[in-house]
Amino acid sequence: MRLGFAGAGGDALSYAVDLGLPPPKPPSAFNRDPEVKTEVIWSGPVPRPAARLVERAGAALRVRDGRGWATVGRVLPPWTSMLTEYADPQAAPEMLTLRDAVRAWRFYDHFRCDVQAPARAPQLGSRTPVLSGDGHDFAAALQTINEIGDAEALYAAVADAFDGAQVAVQISDDGRFEVTMQQPGMLRPLRTAELSDGTLRFLMWAVALLTPRPPPLMVLNEPETSLHPDLLPALGALIARASRETQLIVVSHAMRLVAAIEDAAPADACQRIELEKSLGETVAQCHGACDAPQWHWPER
């Protein structure tokens, strides 16, 4: 299996890793675990010999040293990446730069909204510019947007989605934060524990997308789950807005959401890639939209 990505820009860092099965000897219960065969960091889109900055072959690692190479006197375990095993800001600053960039990526797969979900309970709060994957810091993240983020955009998105509703953060005497929602016609605000699954999930998506610290890449998996169809246009507008500051990959089965994103985003800012099954294999049906940057896999 091979994984890789190219950085944006002509001199940006690119990375590739090639994984395979280990040799059968010595015998081990883990002989089915993949191991790293090669890893390469290079500058630009193509891993030409002159563009390579760091190379790994099996357990051996070498880094660029002027016009030549310097071998790192350290044996790398075959089951771990060189990005986690070696860090030297002098000899290989590219590894630290790349590692920090990858760590900044955010993946949101599923926000829990069940009765026992962490987001439904009051939680101790501290400044939270990035919403966690399980949503336990939901109230603190919303309050952080109130203080240092685009609170106006948050309030506008909620009002648009829920017919003029307003959200607020209540803070108890012991420092616990809880989100409340005031809807027109209701005599009192609803606590987080009283919100429907779809309402809570939309609010969490809004907080994640309006983060005061946008990442270089954010991936959303089926954000339409549990949402009422009438909420999808508002969610699409939020996603389109967030795409101004970060690269977004959205995996969705809801064509209404896809259409809402395309309607809200600039014409050249959105690329649709449709997937279909062909003899049990998932393939991309791009119809000319998948013209990717030039890419070459490094050889083993």
Which residues does each PLM region occupy?
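Short, low-complexity Ser/Thr-rich regulatory SLiMs
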Residues: 19-23, 171, 276-277
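A residue-level structural signal marking coil residues immediately N-terminal to beta-strands
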Residues: 215-216, 246
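Short, mixed charged/polar active-site loops
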Residues: 10-14, 187-189, 281
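Short beta-strand segments that buttress and anchor functional surface loops
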Residues: 1-8, 181
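Electropositive, glycine-dotted interaction segments
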Residues: 6-156
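Conserved ABC ATPase signature
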Residues: 143, 152, 156-159, 163-210, ...
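Short beta-strand micro-motifs in enzyme catalytic cores
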Residues: 1, 106, 177-179
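C-terminal lobe/lid and adjacent interdomain/linker elements of RecA-like ASCE P-loop ATPase modules
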Residues: 233-300
